């Protein structure tokens, strides 16, 4: 028997759109590009086929454009910053795809979306230069979001987590990190010879949670040295960003394909940054659109 989702759990706006994103089921493509910055949606849409835009929707930090690129139907959606927003976005995308809004029940045939986050990141290994494109084969969530869902351990790599917490001298008062993998088929399709691959930390903040120190000291001043030196079964941690773990983890729980690819705009280990990174991101966007 299909579950029924009451109005308190699934909030549908008067116009038939989902609560936060404000888009309707028919406006969502199977292929979805996720970007953090609402302004980047227009950059992605600038590559779409002429006169192919089906909808432009804006609600809070969430902007959506659906159109086609070389005949492929694609939605580009901005998420804002952080895994808390990702919890909203991925749940609402899944609801749009797999819940019948008229009956408030799960559809008999479930739809699997392709979710690709295009973002920016800070590199943690000196051999990955500024401007590189870096795919997160594994995402390490410092945020704790996945622990609120049943099935967390079944989709996570527990041995990796245990080794990481021991190596980082993990603060027991912090949420335990979770480690999840990107969809292998999607990674193989997009991460070709022009991209690096690695394991990415999704931090739940930009400053202290990524080892940055301004006026407040941090709990573990050696955290980034420990991150750089960590190795597990041939894997190393390559970069920081702030959304990918929740995208990958929730997609695994819901039956969607997901991955994150970022342009490296800061090199934490050599204390360098590139503020003129937009041309690199534009090239990354076009590359992903060709391969998704």
Label every PLM stretch briefly.
Residues 2-178:
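Metabolite-binding pocket within alpha/beta catalytic cores that recognizes anionic/polar moieties
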Residues 38-41, 87-90, 183-187, 243-248, ...:
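Short, hydrophobic/amphipathic alpha-helical packing segments
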Residues 48-52, 94-97, 101, 190-194, ...:
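Structural signal for hydrophobic packing residues in well-ordered secondary-structure cores
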Residues 122, 139, 201-208, 246, ...:
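Glycine-rich beta-alpha junction loops
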Residues 159-232:
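Active-site rim beta-loop-alpha module in soluble metabolic enzymes
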Residues 234-238:
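Short pre-catalytic strand/loop immediately N-terminal to key active-site residues, enriched for Gly-Thr
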Residues 240-257, 261:
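Short glycine-rich, acidic/polar surface loops and turns
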Residues 267-292:
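His/Asp/Glu-rich mid-to-C-terminal helical/loop segments that flank catalytic regions of hydrolases
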């Amino acid at each position: 028997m299909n579950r029924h989702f009451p109005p308190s759990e699934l909030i549908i706006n008067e116009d038939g759109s989902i609560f936060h994103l404000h888009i309707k089921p028919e406006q969502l493509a199977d292929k979805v590009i996720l970007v953090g910055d609402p302004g980047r949606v227009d950059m992605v849409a600038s590559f779409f086929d002429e006169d192919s835009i089906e909808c432009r929707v804006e609600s809070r930090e969430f902007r959506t454009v659906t159109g086609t690129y070389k005949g492929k139907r694609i939605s580009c959606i901005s998420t804002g910053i952080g895994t808390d927003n990702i919890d909203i976005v991925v749940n609402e995308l899944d609801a749009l795809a797999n819940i019948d809004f008229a009956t408030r029940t799960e559809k008999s045939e479930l739809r699997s979306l392709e979710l690709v986050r295009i973002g920016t990141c800070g590199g943690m290994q000196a051999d990955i230069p500024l401007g590189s494109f870096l795919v997160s084969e594994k995402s390490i969530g410092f945020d704790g979001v996945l622990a609120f869902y049943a099935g967390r351990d079944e989709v996570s790599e527990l041995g990796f987590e245990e080794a990481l917490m021991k190596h980082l001298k993990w603060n027991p008062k912090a949420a335990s990190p979770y480690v999840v993998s990107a969809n292998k088929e999607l990674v193989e399709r997009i991460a070709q010879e022009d991209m690096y691959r690695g394991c990415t930390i999704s931090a739940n903040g930009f400053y202290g949670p990524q080892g940055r120190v301004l006026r407040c000291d941090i709990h573990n001043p050696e955290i980034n040295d420990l991150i750089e030196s960590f190795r597990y079964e041939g894997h190393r941690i390559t970069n920081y960003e702030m959304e990918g773990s929740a995208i990958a983890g929730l997609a695994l729980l819901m039956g969607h394909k997901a991955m994150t690819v970022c342009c490296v705009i800061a090199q934490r280990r050599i204390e360098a940054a590139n503020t003129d990174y937009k041309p690199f991101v534009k090239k990354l966007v076009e590359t992903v659109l060709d391969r998704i």
